[in-house]
Amino acid sequence: HISANIGSGLSILKISSPEKYERVGGTLMGGGSLIGLSKLIIGIDNYEKILELAEKGNNENIDITKKDFLKENEDLKTENDIISSLGKIHQYILDGKKNEIKKEDIALSLLNMICYHITQYTVLYAKKNDVDTIYYFGTFTKNNSLVNKILNNASKHWNKDIKVRFNNYRI
């Protein structure tokens, strides 16, 4: 299986047995990126507070999704697929409606952006290493149902057959 340790960034390990494992990849995007971007954009650098806001947000207000391009009669199965994180903010600013942008929506958009980035890497490494199960763990996921839900959905977005598990421990 693949073990994805998400903290400030992401470290991806391929686990062949309890005694045999190797680091196969990672990325610099993780909780540190979420906190830094959140501080810069909405002035909040507390992880728990960011997640509280994200729980109340609707990213479709500021992300461009497939729904924005669908005609009335088109298939809506994937209408919420994100095409561009924060993609609608530019129009809010052009229309003079910058103060209508909600911190909650930005928090959720940023969380989705980080989670989709993380899962794209982990699913690609799982495929490259012929593995069908990913275990996510670390401070980013610990006892966090919203993060775990997004990671699960995003992993399935990249590969519907991937098995996703969560461990509530950190190393």
Language-model region placement:
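Short Gly/Thr/Asp-enriched flexible loops that form oxyanion-binding sites at enzyme active sites
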Residues: 13-17, 21, 144-153
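Glycine-rich beta-strand-to-loop/alpha-helix junction loops that act as flexible
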Residues: 6-9, 131-144, 167-168
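Adenine-nucleotide phosphate-binding core of ATP-dependent small-molecule kinases
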Residues: 75-133, 140
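Conserved phosphate-binding/catalytic loops in two-lobed NTP-binding clefts
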Residues: 151-171
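Glycine-rich phosphate-binding loop plus the immediately following alpha-helix
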Residues: 18-71
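Short beta-strand scaffold segments in enzyme catalytic cores
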Residues: 3, 9-15
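Short glycine-aspartate micro-motif
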Residues: 1-5, 26
